[in-house]
Amino acid sequence: MLVFLHAVFITVLILLLIGRLQLLERLLLNHSLNLKTVNNVLGVTDTGLKVNCLQLLKPDCLDFNILHRSLAETRLLKVVLRVIFLVLLGFCCYRLLVTLI
């Protein structure tokens, strides 16, 4: 019974972590969209001037590749956690059936 409660506790923690990762994914998408919007609104042909304007507006996240990479890593981590969640859920159901029979 203790193993079952431990598995349920870990399953709940994984669900909370998946929720936090979804929030992080939304924040990354929002930040990426804001940078692209600022980039399109400026419409400056000189890339040096565009980078300087973007540095004034968003100095901490100019590299779109870093944003897209961290977004992909967040999505991959979310998939891995969902797989772990399903395995633990199956284990919990199995343990519950074994204890009931």
From Swiss-Prot:
Q: Does the keyword Transmembrane apply?
A: yes
Q: Where are the transmembrane segments?
A: 81-101
Membrane topology note: Single-pass membrane protein
Pfam family example for this protein?
Answer: Corona_7
A cellular component term (GO) from this record? Answer: membrane
Residues in the signal sequence? 1-23
Compartments, as annotated in UniProt? Host membrane
Q: What is its main location?
A: host cell
Q: Which InterPro entries match?
A: Corona_7
Positions in coiled-coil regions: none
- Provide the alphabetized UniProt keywords: Host membrane, Membrane, Signal, Transmembrane, Transmembrane helix
Family according to the record: Belongs to the coronaviruses ns7/ns7a protein family.
Function of this protein?
May function in the formation of membrane-bound replication complexes or in the assembly of the virus.
Q: What is this protein called?
A: Non-structural protein 7a
Where does this protein come from, organism-wise? Canine coronavirus (strain K378) (CCoV)
